[in-house]
Amino acid sequence: MVCLKTLSVFLAAFAAADARAVFKTQGHKNSEMIPDNYIVVMKDGVSQDDFKAHISSVASIHSTNKAKRGTNTQGMKREFDIMNWRGYHGHFDRDTLEEILNDSKVDYVEQDQVVRISGLVTQRSAPSWGLGRVSHRQAGSRDYVFDDSAGRGVTIYGVDTGIDINHQDFRGRARWGTNTADRDNADRHGHGTHTASTFAGTAYGIAKNANIVAVKVLGSDGSGSTSGIIAGINYCVQDAQQRGILGKAAMNLSLGGGFSQANNDAVTRAQNAGIFVAVAAGNDNRDARNYSPASAPAVCTVASSTINDSKSSFSNWGPVVDIYAPGSDIIAARPGGGSTTMSGTSMASPHVAGMGAYMIGMGADPRQVCDRLKQLATAAIRNPGSSTTNRLLYNGSGQ
C-alpha cells in the first residue's frame, strides 16, 4: 500500500512536470533580448475557443499581478494564428510568466529578441550584374534572359522596412499590406524598397510581372523584434488565404536574429500553407544554423555570392544554406525614385524570392520550388564555406 501511494505521488509529480510548458532559450551569444517580452506558443490542437479563454485568463492574471505589485508591464500585445498555429506576444512580469508556463495548453515560451536587416549599403554607382548571372551558366553576361510570364499572377510579400509602393520601378503593381513596426508606413530606411525592386522591379527585378505587398516589420534603423516578424508573417498568410492566392504567393525575409523556435515555426507554417519563403542566411560569416529564420528547415535559405562567383566575405554559411545568389554590389530602387547599390544576404534572398515567383507563375508548387531551384542551380561557388552547397541560382533559360 505504501508502495502504491509512493507511485501515485511520483506519477502525479511527473504529470505536473510534463504539463509545464518549456521555456526556450535562444543559443546565439549575440542575441539581443527584449526585457520582459515573451512569445507564447500554444500546443497543436488547441481550439480557437480554448485559445481565447487562455488569453482572457492571462489578461486577468496580469491585471491582478500588476495591481498587486505595481509593475509597469503592458500585458497582451499581439495574437497570432497562422493556419491554426496559435500564440501571442506580451509584456509580462515574472509571476504572470510562471502562470503561463503552468498552463497545460501552452507548448513553449521564448523571450522576444531584436531582429535586424541583413544588408549593407555600399557605393551607389556600382554596376548591376545579378540578373545576367542568374540567367547564364557562365559568369560575365549582362543580358537577362527570361520567360516573359515573369511571375504574372503571383504575389510576393516583402517582409522588411516597408516599400515605396509608388516607385516607378513597380509600375502600379505594389500595394500596402500592414505595419507591425511603428506608426510610419513609409520606407525611411530604403532596404525594403531595394529588396522589392530586386524580386519584382520592372527594371531591376527577377519576376517583373509579379504583384508586390509591403509588410513593414522593421523600423527606420533597420531593426525590429521577433514578435513583430511573426505578426507580419501572420498577416501574409491570412491575406493570402482571404484573397485565395495560397499556392500563388511568395515571401521574402531579408532579415534575421538569433535562433528562435517561434520564428522558425511561423515561417514553416507559411511555407506549408502554400507560400514560397526565401530568407537571408545572415551577414556575420558564421554558421547560419544559429540564426532565425535562416535555420528553419522548411524555407529556402540564401547565402550571398560575388560577381566572381565567390562567397561574399560577410555571408553566413553552413548546412542549412540551400543556395547561393548574387548579393554583393546589387543595384535596385531606392525610396523617392532612382536607384542605389547595397550588399548583403539581404540582396541575395530577393533574387531567390523572385525566382520562386517566376517558377510558380509557370506552374510550380510553392512547396517544391526550393528543391527545383537547387536542381537547376549551377555548381559555381568557390570556397562556399564548411559543409555548404556550392550551387548558384539559375533560372533554366538554357543560356
Curated annotation (Swiss-Prot):
Protein EC? 3.4.21.-
Coiled-coil ranges (or none): none
- Classify the main location: secreted
Lineage, top-rank taxon, reads Eukaryota
Has keyword Hydrolase? yes
Q: Which SUPFAM superfamilies match?
A: Protease propeptides/inhibitors, Subtilisin-like
* Residues annotated as signal peptide: 1-19
Q: Name one Pfam family in it.
A: Peptidase_S8
Q: Glycans attached where?
A: N102, N252, N308, N395
The residues covered by the Inhibitor I9 domain are 38-117
* Prodomain residues: 20-118
The active site of this protein is located at D160, H191, S346
**Localization per Swiss-Prot or TrEMBL:** Secreted
Per UniProt, the keywords (alphabetical) are: Glycoprotein, Hydrolase, Protease, Secreted, Serine protease, Signal, Virulence, Zymogen
GO CC annotation terms, alphabetical: extracellular region
Disulfide partners: none
Q: Which GO terms describe its molecular function?
A: serine-type endopeptidase activity
Peptidase S8 domain residues: 128-399
| CDD domains xref list | Peptidases_S8_PCSK9_ProteinaseK_like
Which biological process terms from the Gene Ontology are attached to this UniProt entry?
A: proteolysis
Instruction: Name the enzyme group at the top EC level.
Output: hydrolase
Bilayer-crossing residues are none
| Purpose | Secreted subtilisin-like serine protease with keratinolytic activity that contributes to pathogenicity.
Return the similarity comment.
Belongs to the peptidase S8 family.
- Specify the protein name: Subtilisin-like protease 4
Gene name tied to this protein: SUB4
